[in-house]
């Protein structure tokens, strides 16, 4: 516990000195303690709840309910996108992202207090239809748009609200001051979507067209 407090305090001071967010991005597991350690720090020290961004909050239903309580106290929470949630729902207790966001909103949580991430292209277990572990895949960044589409098409949330979870909210929380908005002085990062399907039509990164008419124009990792 003391080491965790020290890490949180050091990150906070480092953020202040460097002009960066200085938050702790906490990867949560399946354990029954949920967010207990984070909540203890918030209640027993002067470190604010905004110092933490717990992720994987939708990995099971009991962890998600704990995350709802955490968000009620002003905490920000991060969902992990999953392009194969239809299969995962059959064999795990994972909470579908769009369902979780609807639940947060119905609980009175601010639309500013949640984000969606892909786990940074991290490892993602693969299972057979019977639930047997088959190996590791990759948590794809494309899951972000998929989750936004489900928020709109499955839960009928306004597009502008769903987009906050992958644009302005993470930019604000991480203090990425040139990201998250289309405005003078911001990076020219824009995605154009087909009106009905919300599939990608055009991608512009820092003013450069990367995808046009759904066809990539830039393919190299470092281009």
Residue ranges and their predicted role:
Residues 71-72, 152, 186, 204:
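Alpha-helix boundary recognition
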Residues 106-186, 190-193:
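His/Asp/Glu-enriched, well-ordered alpha-helical/loop segment
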């Amino acid at each position: 516990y003391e080491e965790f407090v020290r890490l949180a305090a050091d990150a906070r001071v480092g953020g202040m000195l460097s002009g960066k967010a200085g938050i702790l991005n906490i990867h949560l597991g399946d354990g029954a303690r949920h967010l207990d350690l984070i909540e203890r720090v918030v209640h027993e020290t002067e470190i604010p709840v905004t110092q933490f961004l717990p992720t994987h909050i939708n990995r099971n239903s009991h962890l998600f309910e704990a995350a709802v309580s955490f968000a009620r106290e002003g905490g920000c929470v991060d969902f992990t996108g999953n392009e194969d949630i239809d299969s995962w729902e059959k064999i795990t207790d994972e909470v579908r992202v769009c369902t979780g966001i609807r639940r947060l909103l119905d609980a009175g949580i601010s639309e500013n207090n949640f984000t969606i991430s892909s786990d940074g292209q991290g490892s993602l277990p693969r299972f057979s239809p019977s639930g047997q572990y088959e190996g590791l895949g990759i948590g794809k960044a494309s899951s972000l748009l998929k989750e936004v589409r489900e928020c709109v098409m499955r839960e009928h949330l306004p597009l502008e609200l769903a987009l906050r979870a992958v644009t302005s909210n993470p930019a604000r929380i991480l203090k990425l001051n040139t990201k998250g908005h289309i405005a003078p002085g911001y990076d020219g990062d824009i995605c154009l979507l087909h009106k009905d399907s919300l599939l990608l039509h055009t991608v512009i990164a820092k003013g450069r067209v990367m995808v046009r008419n759904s066809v990539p124009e830039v393919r190299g990792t470092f281009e």
